[in-house]
């Protein structure tokens, strides 16, 4: 092996395999762009985003870590969410949960 060399297995890497997902339509009713990061608790996003908020409790965007989705003013788009993993305890964000899901 050469220092720094990558040894990558053949095939595709599937993100969040086996976890429950949800696809829903989200609209930005505000007058400014809103960007949501990959691990932000979607239930607690900006109130200008219009969607079935209750159905998103305990979920985040199903996108690669470190990336984000941007919603321009007046824009509507479909997004896919995935269940949060781990201990399923949420603190911070908008302060709407602050504990166990």
Swiss-Prot record:
What protein name is recorded for this chain? Urease subunit beta
What GO MF annotations does this protein's record show?
urease activity
Annotated GO biological process: urea catabolic process
- Entry coiled-coil feature ranges: none
* Compartments it resides in: Cytoplasm
- Lineage, top-rank taxon, reads Bacteria
Concerning PANTHER family, the annotation shows:
UREASE
Q: What is the annotated quaternary arrangement, including any partners?
A: Heterotrimer of UreA (gamma), UreB (beta) and UreC (alpha) subunits. Three heterotrimers associate to form the active enzyme.
What reaction does this catalyse?
urea + 2 H2O + H(+) = hydrogencarbonate + 2 NH4(+)
Pfam families documented for this protein: Urease_beta (PF00699)
Q: List the source organism.
A: Ectopseudomonas mendocina (strain ymp)
Pathway membership of this protein? Nitrogen metabolism; urea degradation; CO(2) and NH(3) from urea (urease route): step 1/1
Cite the source lineage: Bacteria, Pseudomonadati, Pseudomonadota, Gammaproteobacteria, Pseudomonadales
Kindly state which keywords UniProt assigns to this record, in alphabetical order: Cytoplasm, Hydrolase
- What family does the Swiss-Prot or TrEMBL record give for this protein? Belongs to the urease beta subunit family.
Any one GO CC term of the record: urease complex
CDD domains to which the protein is assigned, alphabetical: Urease_beta
Q: What is its EC number?
A: 3.5.1.5
